[in-house]
């Protein structure tokens, strides 16, 4: 498609079943589209042997495609991105989950969208156009929709999906946003979009289908929901 290179940051924790599948899908769809890329696996000391699987994948696909940058323990999503950016050789960075909830088939669409509008950030959205969520029960859908609706009213971010974590950034833009954010956990993704608006960065959107994880347990719990509410109040008061 171009001489651009895309560094895909994959923070992992207990994803030994999912990592081989997401890696295969990434290589399939990006190679078919002629996209130059690398996958940077940032494993935070997974006790299930995720890193061992990542090493096997590196042996299969090569060190240029699979870059391993593990850490000793869980240190948070924001610091995982900072760690990954330091090792990224692409001029664009893609962030996504390793649990198969984000399908790599949407990445070429995100790249095309970025080129069309010369956007600083392109976000995959579940809440616009043909986007949607599959595999969630009604309660979780209501919580997610409700949180997004309240956030839209309070923060007016200029994007339809604030809590999603499937995005394409210019590398320098992601670096500045990550360094400016103070939130932890799920609020971090929301703050990234709010700060992007604050700094005057342009945001494009591509509708995506979000699928609940197939293997492993969801990391969303009561403490994350409380943290989300606190983070929303903080951002409303400070932006």
Functional labels for PLM-detected ranges:
Residues 37-40, 51-87:
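Conserved donor nucleotide-binding strand/loop of the catalytic core
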Residues 43-51, 100:
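A conserved acidic beta->alpha catalytic loop
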Residues 69-87, 92, 104-186, 213-230, ...:
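Acceptor/aglycone-binding surface of glycosyltransferases and processive sugar-polymer synthases
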Residues 157-158, 180-184, 193-211:
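Catalytic donor-sugar/metal-binding loop of nucleotide-sugar-dependent glycosyltransferases
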């Amino acid at each position: 498609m171009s001489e651009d290179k895309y560094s895909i940051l994959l923070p992992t924790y207990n994803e030994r079943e999912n990592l081989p599948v997401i890696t295969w899908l990434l290589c399939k769809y990006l190679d078919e589209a002629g996209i130059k890329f690398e996958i940077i696996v940032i494993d935070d000391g997974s006790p299930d042997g995720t890193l061992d699987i990542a090493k096997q994948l590196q042996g299969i696909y090569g060190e240029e495609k699979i870059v391993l940058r593990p850490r000793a323990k869980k240190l948070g999503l924001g610091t995982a991105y900072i760690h990954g950016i330091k090792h990224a050789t692409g001029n664009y960075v893609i962030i996504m989950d390793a649990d198969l909830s984000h399908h790599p088939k949407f990445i070429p669409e995100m790249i095309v969208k970025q080129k069309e509008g010369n956007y600083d950030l392109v976000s995959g959205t579940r809440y616009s156009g043909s986007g949607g969520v599959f595999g969630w029960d009604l309660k979780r859908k209501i919580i997610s929709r409700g949180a997004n609706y309240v956030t839209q009213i309070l923060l007016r971010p200029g994007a339809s999906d604030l809590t999603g974590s499937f995005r394409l950034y210019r590398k320098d833009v992601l670096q500045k946003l990550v360094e400016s954010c103070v939130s932890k956990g799920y609020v971090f993704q929301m703050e990234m979009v709010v700060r992007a608006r604050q700094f005057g960065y342009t945001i494009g959107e591509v509708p995506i289908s979000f699928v609940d994880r197939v293997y492993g347990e969801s990391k969303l719990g009561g403490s994350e929901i409380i943290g989300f509410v606190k983070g929303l109040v903080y951002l409303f008061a400070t932006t």
